[in-house]
Amino acid sequence: MTVGKSSKMLQHIDYRMRCILQDGRIFIGTFKAFDKHMNLILCDCDEFRKIKPKNSKQAEREEKRVLGLVLLRGENLVSMTVEGPPPKDTGIARVPLAGAAGGPGIGRAAGRGIPAGVPMPQAPAGLAGPVRGVGGPSQQVMTPQGRGTVAAAAAAATASIAGAPTQYPPGRGGPPPPMGRGAPPPGMMGPPPGMRPPMGPPMGLPPGRGTPMGMPPPGMRPPPPGMRGLL
């Protein structure tokens, strides 16, 4: 059902209405809505009914019941009358105007996470990101803690491989002396002064066949002439 703006029912919305039903009960409440079947919705509704006494000497008494929100069927409705004007909206909080005087409180946005006064935690040295611009910390400060010994050992190993002089621990003697080309091994006598050391194959390689051997060491007789080719 289409209801026009000039309908009398719309003019009584939010009014306190008295509704009388067929069984004699009276409902007084705030009129909120209706439909084409005259079904009504009342809020803050009170029910009033008259109770007949058992004896004729006693008068009728009226009983009141607080119901709240009520839906009334239109088929039971007999009449509707205005009980009072719309109630004032005292319980609804309204937004204050910009020019209105403020109270003692201060309006602030609700904070999320860490409060504003608490300082932010910073990452330890060496674990933070790169510093932009000039004036950042030195490389020693940026080196992660706990890894200095590993880096020093790696640097020492690289230096020894590259040819740096190796330091030997004390108490175990120095490095073995270098051996020259003509120097005899330890425990053997060298050639007398003025004599040339024998020319032989490099150390560690046996003399090949047909290769003339060098001069024998002093004190040893050379092999016979016929035996030289067999060696």
Curated annotation (Swiss-Prot):
Tagged with keyword Repeat: yes
Annotated positions of the Asymmetric dimethylarginine modification: R108, R112
Sequence repeat feature ranges: 175-181, 191-196, 216-221, 222-228
Gene3D superfamilies per record: 2.30.30.100
CDD domains documented for this protein: Sm_B
Record region (Disordered): 163-231
BP-aspect Gene Ontology terms: mRNA splicing, via spliceosome; spliceosomal snRNP assembly
Record's subcellular location: Cytoplasm, Cytosol; Nucleus
Modified positions (Dimethylated arginine) in chain numbering: R108, R112
Keywords: Cytoplasm, Methylation, mRNA processing, mRNA splicing, Nucleus, Repeat, Ribonucleoprotein, RNA-binding, Spliceosome
Domain Sm: 4-86
Region span, Repeat-rich region: 175-228
Pfam family, one: LSM
Protein family per UniProt: Belongs to the snRNP SmB/SmN family.
Protein name (record): Small nuclear ribonucleoprotein-associated protein B
Organism lineage string: Eukaryota, Metazoa, Chordata, Craniata, Vertebrata
Gene that specifies this protein: Snrpb
